[in-house]
A protein has these predicted regions:
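N-terminal presequence-like segments and the immediate start of the first folded domain
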Residues: 1-70, 74-87, 93-144
């Protein structure tokens, strides 16, 4: 049997699916389907920079994760979306970073919201600036 979340499906637009044929993890959803009239918001890769372009948390993965999530929330808001509208994250993390700190920052921001998004994560040798430790992009679906 497939576990389906109906929280947003009542509007007939977003359905979160965790089929029993795939590993279940409360940190992410395996499949998200979108139907109907919706607005899709694409947030390009965000790094740990503040509004002046200064890098926040040089050498501190947790501080950078917190800034990245703050930037994503600001980008989502600019696009008319909220964090709970995110259906997909892509995370790029420089090899050797303490993942637990990044996940703790994510959980602190995500809180008790239902339906965590589908997630892809890749370890990389480096990013656009040598002080960047992570980058995250997101896709959000806003019911109309």
């Amino acid at each position: 049997m497939t576990k389906r979340s109906e929280s947003m499906k009542t509007k007939g637009q977003v359905e979160y699916i965790n089929p029993e044929t795939l590993h279940q993890n409360p940190a992410f959803t395996n499949v998200v389907t979108v139907t109907g009239s919706v607005r899709t918001v694409y947030v390009g890769g965000q790094n740990a920079v503040d509004t002046s372009g200064e890098i926040v948390g040089k050498g501190d993965f947790k501080a950078q994760s917190e800034q990245i999530l703050k930037n994503i929330q600001a980008a989502l808001e600019a696009g008319g979306a909220r964090l709970e509208h995110v259906v997909k994250w892509n995370m790029y993390i420089v090899q050797g970073q303490p993942l637990q700190e990044g996940f703790a920052a994510f959980q602190q921001v995500w809180g008790n919201r239902p339906n965590p998004p589908a997630i892809s994560m890749a370890f990389v040798a480096g990013l656009a600036h040598p002080d960047f430790l992570a980058e995250i992009d997101a896709i959000a679906v806003v019911p109309q």
